[in-house]
Amino acid sequence: MNRLPKILVSCPTASAKNYTALEWMLNTQKFTYPNYDVIVFDNTDDNGSNADYLNELAISNGILNYQAIHYSTNKHESIIERMCISHNHARELAINNNYSHLFHLESDVICPIDTLQNLYIHNKSVCGGLYYRDSGISRKLMAQRRIYRSSRNVATENFLPNEDIDFIDGNLKTIAAIGLGCVLIDLKTLKKIQFRFMPNVDLHSDSYFSEDCFRNNIKIFADTNIICKHNNENWDLYGLNWK
């Protein structure tokens, strides 16, 4: 029987996300998909001490399939730039080591343990699960739909309050943008699209990734049966009062 291909599970992280690091690590160790490596890129502005802390945290909790790699940051880099650099470290690692896919799971997103397996089964170039940002009246689905106003006026827009209820029906759907919080990207797409950002523009590389997929005629799919927990919905639970 052919062995399932190996998938890279990765994301940027930093000391700001240490409040949920252990939960994230433990979540990744329970995946039902049998063949994957977990390697994260720590962009904390230090000498590597936070990456060391994360690796020691994993070992002390019996977690063997986990590695945090630090890269030397430039103090002039913005958070957006640091995250984009980390995204590309993950992309390059997947390409150079011939992983079949990159499963990008943000460091504060906790997914159902069969998520990776189900996304792989869909056999799409780009396919992700859903999650929310914030809570209460500020809650927003981290996904966008595409609006065709005319042949020359194509835009994306967020779901309005309560519209997500109709969208999330358990089916697989095409979508304009799904972010990088919980998304499986195949090797062919990774080779074609590099993560990018624009200096002095308040947009993260996930926005440009979705735009570049559209320009390359790569459809983005959302499995609306996959709803993840997002550990920034209420940071007060973790003793934090910032976002």
Describe each region flagged by the PLM.
Residues 35-46, 70-71:
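Short beta-strand/loop segment that forms part of the nucleotide-sugar
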Residues 47-99:
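Active-site-proximal specificity loops/subdomain of glycosyltransferases
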Residues 24-36:
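Short, acidic, metal-binding catalytic loop of nucleotide-sugar glycosyltransferases
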